[in-house]
């Protein structure tokens, strides 16, 4: 389970330390790919394989399906953590997410996201502005 928000440095080689609390869930490997809203998404390999099966089962006659498959699969990088608990984010993915020397790693339960700090601040501002909508969603769940 991925929970919390962490700020970490990206070194000159593009390596990013994964939060210690996330590492056990990534022992089997991690897949990083393009995410929504110009971030990156990270998945444990088993969760990625489940998602890939489901997305691959969608009808390819649909333009939306093809675009989703391109977004997820064409930029995906399958990797393992190094001894220091870091991953090497490929240059094309760093450029996509506009990552510099800092990144925010945000846990989202079954996966995590990697954000440029400036973009993450915009996400937090939007969440604040939509708090009442989120409360309604929780009410729909009878929570």
Swiss-Prot record:
GO cellular component: cytoplasm; nucleoid
Domain of life of the organism encoding this protein: Bacteria
GO molecular function, one term: DNA-binding transcription factor activity
InterPro entries, alphabetized: MraZ (IPR003444), MraZ_C (IPR035644), MraZ_dom (IPR020603), MraZ_N (IPR035642), MraZ_sf (IPR038619), SpoVT-AbrB_dom (IPR007159), SpoVT-AbrB_sf (IPR037914)
UniProt-listed Pfam families: MraZ
Main localization category: cytoplasm
Annotated GO biological process: negative regulation of DNA-templated transcription initiation
Subcellular location(s) per record: Cytoplasm, Nucleoid
Domain SpoVT-AbrB: residue ranges: 5-47, 76-119
CDD domains: MraZ_C (cd16321), MraZ_N (cd16320)
UniProt keyword Hydrolase present: no
Keyword Transcription regulation included in the entry's annotation: yes
Keywords: Cytoplasm, DNA-binding, Repeat, Transcription, Transcription regulation
Subunit structure: Forms oligomers.
NCBIfam families with a match to the protein in the record: division/cell wall cluster transcriptional repressor MraZ (TIGR00242)
Family note: Belongs to the MraZ family.
Cross-referenced HAMAP family: MraZ
Protein name: Transcriptional regulator MraZ
């Amino acid at each position: 389970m991925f929970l919390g928000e962490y700020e970490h440095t990206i070194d000159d080689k593009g390596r990013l330390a994964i939060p210690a609390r996330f590492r056990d869930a990534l022992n089997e490997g991690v897949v990083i790919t393009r995410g929504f809203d110009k971030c990156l998404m990270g998945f444990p390999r088993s969760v990625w394989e489940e998602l890939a099966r489901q997305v691959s089962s969608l009808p390819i006659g649909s333009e939306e399906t093809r675009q989703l498959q391109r977004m997820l699969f064409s930029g995906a990088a399958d990797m393992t953590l190094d001894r220091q608990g870091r991953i090497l984010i490929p240059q094309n993915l760093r450029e996509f997410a506009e990552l510099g020397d800092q990144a925010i790693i945000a846990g989202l339960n079954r996966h995590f996201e990697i954000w440029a700090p400036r973009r993450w601040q915009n996400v937090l501002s939007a969440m604040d502005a939509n708090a009442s909508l989120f409360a309604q969603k929780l009410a729909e769940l009878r929570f």
